[in-house]
């Protein structure tokens, strides 16, 4: 039977110290000093990183079972806790005799000659114990549900607590190690250590070689949110449509995932998959030739270019759809991207199909010079014939980011323009504007919510509703599912 201890982190806003028992170290002491209100998280005491020894009582765990853990709330109520994973048992005991014996041990320590020699008021160990026994606000019982919810994170030893005003998710040592592969090696010992300073107090986090192996082993399982810097389990993220489960932020999606989201299974028929760029102006940079860069992105993404085009069905309604992929050279629009989108529009016009283009681009591709710029006019010309002459229906979907030549051409030509929540939409980026005009661009002035208020587009639709909204729009414009259309003709 394997039992795990839970490291209690019980806080209040004006709290000056948070404390707990650190089982794998065999010592008692404050976990970290802070005056803020972090979230309660769970930690695997047997294998996670630990702070330095902070208490001098080496035999304290003689009084505590190897499989139990002690916490105390502000009211003086103490609890002995253990969690049995195999049998799915979570127990909280209030054993007064056990607690009395433990407190008696500390009492003897406090009354020892060491404390009586004038160190009692200045002894950090004594203050740590007093803070631990009496200075926590919330009962452990109020947070058991939070512990269970965060059990998954505890299995790979990620400390996800947020220290407001100090470290954020992005600044967290362990978060950086998971997300960026920050090296933890040190030549001093078998493990490694890093000392930080939070609110005037030193904190040393120790990493063993095993911890480094765990960090590297599980790094590929997580995706970090761009907004809150929280970690999302990659296996579940796709089923959640790449929406952060912690803050609801819409993360970037690949073109293949978007096609899977919008198009009915088994109905996708791609077009012009074999079309590739030939470096028309022989663009060469000091870093990497253009052809080599194209090849590397093709290997990385599995795509031939920054857009996928094809025919499929959306809730049974035949549609022509083009989906740009920001992972391929920032979704930049070169001659191949422009040609594929133009051919898609012409095919939709010939087949009388509604058209969807999902935009995710940094603009025209500079490696192709004026050839990339002329794609704006070519696509706009094809859309003119599709919309005005054929009287067909085009929906433009703007995702983050949509900038440059795409914004200045087909991105803003939709009969209905839809944006995703929090999407970054602009012609020139913030940095370009500030460097050109020498003016500061207000924060959020290029976000979808702000631009919607200015009338730049028609709808802001979250991903989980997008397919149904598109289906209703098509029906409103007399595009029906194939089975309904045939029955109406009869």
Swiss-Prot record:
Keywords: ATP-binding, Chloroplast, Fatty acid biosynthesis, Fatty acid metabolism, Lipid biosynthesis, Lipid metabolism, Metal-binding, Nucleotide-binding, Plastid, Transferase, Zinc, Zinc-finger. Residues 221-490 form the CoA carboxyltransferase N-terminal domain. Its cofactor is Zn(2+). GO terms for biological process: fatty acid biosynthetic process; malonyl-CoA biosynthetic process. Binds 1 zinc ion per subunit. Its EC number is 2.1.3.15. One of its GO terms (molecular function) is carboxyl- or carbamoyltransferase activity. Pathway: Lipid metabolism; malonyl-CoA biosynthesis; malonyl-CoA from acetyl-CoA: step 1/1. It holds the Pfam family Carboxyl_trans. InterPro entries: AcCoA_carboxyl_beta, Acetyl_CoA_COase_Trfase_b_su, ClpP/crotonase-like_dom_sf, COA_CT_N. It is an enzyme of class 2 (transferase). GO terms for cellular component: acetyl-CoA carboxylase complex; chloroplast stroma. It catalyses: N(6)-carboxybiotinyl-L-lysyl-[protein] + acetyl-CoA = N(6)-biotinyl-L-lysyl-[protein] + malonyl-CoA. Zn(2+) binds at residues 225, 228, 244, 247. A zinc finger (C4-type) spans 225-247. SUPFAM superfamilies: ClpP/crotonase. It is found in: Plastid, Chloroplast stroma. Residues 184-203 are annotated as: Disordered. Belongs to the AccD/PCCB family. Acetyl-CoA carboxylase is a heterohexamer composed of biotin carboxyl carrier protein, biotin carboxylase and 2 subunits each of ACCase subunit alpha and ACCase plastid-coded subunit beta (accD). Component of the acetyl coenzyme A carboxylase (ACC) complex. Biotin carboxylase (BC) catalyzes the carboxylation of biotin on its carrier protein (BCCP) and then the CO(2) group is transferred by the transcarboxylase to acetyl-CoA to form malonyl-CoA. HAMAP family: AcetylCoA_CT_beta (MF_01395). This is Acetyl-coenzyme A carboxylase carboxyl transferase subunit beta, chloroplastic.
């Amino acid at each position: 039977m394997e039992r795990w201890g839970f490291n209690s982190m019980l806080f209040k806003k004006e709290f000056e110290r948070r404390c707990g028992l650190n089982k794998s170290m065999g010592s008692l002491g404050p976990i970290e000093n802070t005056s803020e209100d972090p979230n309660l998280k769970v930690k695997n005491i047997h294998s996670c990183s630990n702070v330095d020894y902070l208490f001098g009582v080496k035999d304290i765990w003689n009084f505590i079972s190897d499989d139990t853990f002690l916490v105390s709330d502000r009211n003086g109520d103490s609890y002995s806790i253990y969690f049995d994973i195999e049998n799915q048992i979570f127990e909280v005991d209030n054993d007064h005799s056990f607690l009395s014996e433990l407190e008696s041990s500390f009492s003897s320590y406090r009354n020892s000659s060491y404390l009586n020699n004038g160190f009692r008021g200045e002894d950090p160990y004594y203050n740590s114990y007093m803070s631990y026994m009496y200075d926590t606000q919330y009962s452990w019982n109020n947070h058991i549900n939070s512990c269970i919810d965060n059990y998954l994170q505890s299995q790979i030893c990620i400390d996800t607590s947020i220290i407001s005003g100090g470290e954020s998710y992005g600044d967290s040592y362990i978060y950086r190690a998971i997300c960026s592969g920050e090296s933890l090696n040190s030549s001093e010992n078998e493990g490694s250590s890093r000392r930080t300073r939070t609110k005037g107090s030193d904190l040393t986090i120790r990493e063993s070689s095993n911890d480094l192996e765990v960090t590297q082993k599980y790094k590929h399982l997580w995706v970090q949110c761009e907004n809150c810097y929280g970690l999302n389990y990659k296996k579940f993220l796709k089923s959640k449509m790449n929406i952060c489960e912690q803050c609801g932020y819409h993360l970037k999606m690949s073109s293949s995932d978007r096609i899977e989201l919008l198009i009915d299974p088994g109905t996708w028929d791609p077009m012009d998959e074999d079309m590739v760029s030939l470096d028309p102006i022989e663009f060469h940079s000091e870093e990497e030739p253009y052809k080599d860069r194209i090849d590397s992105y093709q290997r990385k993404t599995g795509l031939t270019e920054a857009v996928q085009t094809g025919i499929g069905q959306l809730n049974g309604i035949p549609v022509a759809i083009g989906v740009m992929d920001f992972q391929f050279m920032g979704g930049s629009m070169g001659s191949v991207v422009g040609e594929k989108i133009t051919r898609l529009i012409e095919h939709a016009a010939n087949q009388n199909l509604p058209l969807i283009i999902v935009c995710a681009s940094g603009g025209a591709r500079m490696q192709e010079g004026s050839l990339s710029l002329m794609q704006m006019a070519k696509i706009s010309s094809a859309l003119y014939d599709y919309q005005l002459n054929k009287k067909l229906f085009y929906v433009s979907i703007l995702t983050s980011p949509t900038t440059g030549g795409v914004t200045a051409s087909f991105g803003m030509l939709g009969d209905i323009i839809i944006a995703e929540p929090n999407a970054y939409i602009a012609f020139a980026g913030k940095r370009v504007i500030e460097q050109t005009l020498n003016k500061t661009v207000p924060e959020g002035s290029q976000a979808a919510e702000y631009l919607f208020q200015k009338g730049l587009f028609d709808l802001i639709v979250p991903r989980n509703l997008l397919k149904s909204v598109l289906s209703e729009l098509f029906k409103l414009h007399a595009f029906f599912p194939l089975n309904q259309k045939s029955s109406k003709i009869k």
